[in-house]
C-alpha cells in the first residue's frame, strides 16, 4: 500500500534537555526578556527547601508571586486562581513546577486570559471555541513526572460540579519552553515517577498500535518504547541515576509526539479516563492495569505491530502484553483494579461510560458492545 497523508509539525516549542535548571532557566528568562515572573506549583514542591524554592532562587529579582496548592486532576477552581495571578500588570512569564496537574492548570489559565474567562463556569465557553490569539504570558515548564502534559496542545481540567475532566484545545497551548533536568525529578515519589513512566509507555504503545499511525508517530513512539523499557527499571533500583532519569524524560517526550499531531490513543487511554473520573484513580495507575489487557484484546488486529514492539523492548519471544505485565509487577505497581480501590459493583457503570469515550471508539479493534467491554474490565479486576 502506498502511504498517503499530510504532516504539520507540532508547536514551535523549545525543549532544553540534560542541562541543569540553574543553567537553563536564567538563559530562558534572559532570551525572552522576562521582567516579571510567577511560579505555579503544588503543595509538596512548595515545601521549604523544595524544588519551588530552588526555582525561586534562580528567578531571583524577576519573581513576583508563587501560586501553590494546585491539586490533582487540575480543578477549575485552581485554574481560576492561576489566571487571577497572571492578570497582574507586567507579568511576562509563568514557570510551572511539577507534574501534569500543575502544567495543565497553567495551560488552561493562559487561555482564560486571552478569552476573558473570569469564573469557573465561564470555562464552558472554551469547549466549543477559543480566540486565535496565542496564549500569554510565556510558559516555561519544569516537569517532575513523565506524564507528557508539558508537550501537548490540550489541557484536561476537572469540573468540580460533575467530576468530569473536560479537554480544552488551542494550537499554541503547549508551553513555550520545557526544561528536562533529571535532577528536578529526584524528589518525585517513587510510585508517581514509575507509574507516570508506565503512562508514557502507554502513550507510545497505543500510538504505535493506532489505526492510522504516521511515519513521524512510528519513529517517535518506537524510540520512546526502547528508551523507557531500558531506563525506567534502572530508576527503580538506582533512583539517583541521572542518566537513567534523563533517558526516561526523553522517552516520555518522544512518547507523546503522536498525540501532538492528532494520532488518537486507544482503549487503554479511554477506559483509563473513565476509571480516573469515576474512582479517582491516577492516570498512571490506570495504564499499569489496563494496557496489558487491552493489548491482549487487540492482538488479532495488531499482532505484527505488537511483535515489533516486543522485540524493541528486548523480549525473547514473549508476548508484548505479558512483558508489560511483568514489568508492572517488577516495578511494584498495581496490576489489578481491585488493588487500586475499584469495587466489583462499579464494573457495569464503568463499562457503559467507557463505550462512549472517543479513544475507545478509535481503538484498533472494535470494542463497541457492553458485553465485550465488561469482559475486558472483568479480566483486569
Locate predicted features.
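A glycine/threonine-rich phosphate-anchoring loop and its flanking beta-alpha core
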Residues: 13, 114-213, 308
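C-terminal charged capping/lid subdomain of soluble metabolic enzymes
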Residues: 310, 314-381
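Short alpha-helical scaffolding segments that buttress acidic/His motifs in well-ordered protein cores
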Residues: 201-205, 248-256, 291, 324, ...
